[in-house]
Amino acid sequence: MRLILLFLAFISFVLCVPEPRKVFGPTSYEEPTSLPVDLPLLSQAAGMAHEPYCHFNDEGKTVGDAEIVWTKWIGLAVQRAKIFHSKSLGVTVSFEGTTASILSILHDVNLALRDPPKELNDAYDEGSQLLSGFVDAYMDVRDDTYAEIVKCMQKYNDTRVTVTGHSLGAAMTALAAMDLEHRLEHGIYKAFAFAMPRTGNAKFASSVDNRIGGRFFYIANGRDWVPHMPPRDWGFQHPSGQVWINPVNSDNWKFYPGQENHFGANTVDPIWTFDDHHGYYFGTGVGHGPGTCPASVGTHTY
């Protein structure tokens, strides 16, 4: 079965790969700095990013300072989403990363850049284009998660809304953060995208900077290959907000200002396994292997 899935994913990849454009967005040469966000917030966000990998029937359980209040979908046809109420991050929605489902895999390999759908168009600056598969994954969950977020904001009298996720869920995090910034009166509070692939073009990256810059962060772990893909010369570009953990799974992390920072994760050749993709982020295990169910926050010792 696994070979069949890999074969289908390969065929889809071949059919969907865009022509190289050889056009790059900006590259930052700013020196790295210390973290611009408190470490406990990153640890807490990592735990909630992992939790969608866990199964149903966990409403009422806690992840760090957060209670799980809603969960939907099982990651086969639609990526699982969970909503928490966190003392430190408010109403938080988290999206599941890629599963073994062929439909989930197809979201990753549908690499064509497309204009935002009409429902998202006003959330982006003109000229923004998004990776098609990630848009499809987000649109599948958009309406139901938004309705539940609004309910939770009212229930807990909390206007803070945070978005998080890992891998494919990190790409969905970026799209959801932009969407919610536009739709909610108070916008988003924070967004944390763990192991995020490139999700759109240079105009998309600039849109993120213009609209949620300083509140959006994406985290790369060691030589994880996922944040390196799709390549920049296919027209893709990361926004600002990179936090790089290097060496992998260590407590050596720094913030790399600007887009595609020259001193950041782009300086290393990616390792083509999932060893660095699933790992320890700010003392919290994320992904298959390091993560626990329910997720444990900040329990890993270095």
UniProtKB/Swiss-Prot annotation:
Localization terms from the record: Secreted; Secreted, Cell wall
Catalytic center residues: S167, D224, H277
EC number: 3.1.1.-
Keywords, in A-Z order: Cell wall, Disulfide bond, Glycoprotein, Hydrolase, Lipid degradation, Lipid metabolism, Secreted, Signal, Virulence
Single Gene Ontology MF annotation: hydrolase activity
Known glycosylation sites: N157
GO cellular component terms attached to this protein's record: extracellular region
Secretion signal span: 1-16
Catalyzed reactions: a monoacylglycerol + H2O = glycerol + a fatty acid + H(+); a diacylglycerol + H2O = a monoacylglycerol + a fatty acid + H(+)
GO BP, sorted A to Z: lipid catabolic process
Disulfide bond listed as a keyword: yes
Paired cysteines (S-S): C54-C293
Keyword Zinc-finger applies: no
Pfam family, any one: Lipase_3
PROSITE patterns: LIPASE_SER
Family recorded in the similarity comment: Belongs to the AB hydrolase superfamily. Lipase family. Class 3 subfamily.
Function: Secreted lipase involved in Dandruff and seborrheic dermatitis (D/SD) probably via lipase-mediated breakdown of sebaceous lipids and release of irritating free fatty acids. Shows activity against monoglyceride and diglyceride substrates, but not triglyceride substrates and does not exhibit regio-selective production of diacylglycerols. Cleaves oleic acid from 1,2 isomers of diolein on both the 1 and the 2 position of the glycerol backbone, resulting mainly in free fatty acids but no monoolein is detected.
PANTHER family: ALPHA/BETA-HYDROLASES SUPERFAMILY PROTEIN, FUNGAL LIPASE-LIKE DOMAIN-CONTAINING PROTEIN
Name the record gives this protein: Secreted mono- and diacylglycerol lipase MDL6
Species for this entry: Malassezia globosa (strain ATCC MYA-4612 / CBS 7966)
